[in-house]
């Protein structure tokens, strides 16, 4: 059944920074340093309710994706996330490899590494029947973020670990796409360098 486009869209302009929410706290947060990775990083909580097909409900859905990306860079613990495709979607898979192998981790002064900016006032409905929507976004990266490698005992800028070629001008640019239904559907990030 096609989506009711009048119900989906509203008159608001959602362009701008989306608030970062990660309040799933299991203990006092301890930032990483050369001696250890971050402890008790705040995890994102699900804020999505699928009761109605409205942009106001879509935004928290995409916000959860954003928070999961940030959490994976900060803590690399996918088990606490309700996002099945996070491993395929990770912006920095080589950092995940360092975490898993115990060879390194991210060092940052803050628990928020990414800032998501919505670049359009409203999403675009690209398939009315399948309810597929897209929204152009930019993820700004905190410039102070570094990656510590135990094997070299050195820190490196996070940009050195951009094996997917996503970063341009200190940010990751692209499009978030999802099928917006009353069930939890994966969000897919489409990098600007793969858009035609």
Task: Mark where each language-model region is.
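Core segments of small alpha/beta cavity-forming domains
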Residues: 24-113
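Long, compositionally biased
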Residues: 112-123
């Amino acid at each position: 059944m096609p989506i009711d486009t009048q119900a989906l869209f509203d008159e608001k302009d959602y362009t701008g920074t989306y608030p970062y929410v990660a309040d799933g706290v299991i203990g006092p947060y301890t930032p990483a340093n050369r001696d250890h990775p971050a402890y008790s990083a705040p995890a994102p909580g699900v804020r999505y309710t699928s009761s109605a097909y409205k942009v106001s409900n879509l935004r928290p859905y995409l916000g959860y994706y954003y928070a999961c990306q940030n959490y994976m860079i900060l803590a690399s613990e996918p088990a606490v996330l309700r996002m099945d495709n996070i491993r395929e979607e990770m912006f920095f898979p080589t950092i995940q490899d360092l975490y898993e192998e115990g060879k390194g981790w991210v060092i940052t002064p803050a628990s928020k590494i990414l800032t998501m900016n919505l670049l359009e006032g409203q999403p675009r409905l690209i398939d009315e029947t399948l309810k597929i929507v897209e929204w152009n976004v930019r993820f700004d990266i905190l410039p102070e973020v570094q990656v510590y490698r135990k094997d070299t005992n050195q820190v490196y800028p996070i940009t050195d670990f951009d094996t997917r070629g996503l970063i341009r001008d200190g940010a990751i640019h692209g499009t978030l796409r999802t099928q917006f239904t009353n069930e939890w559907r994966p969000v897919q990030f489409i990098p600007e360098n793969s858009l035609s």
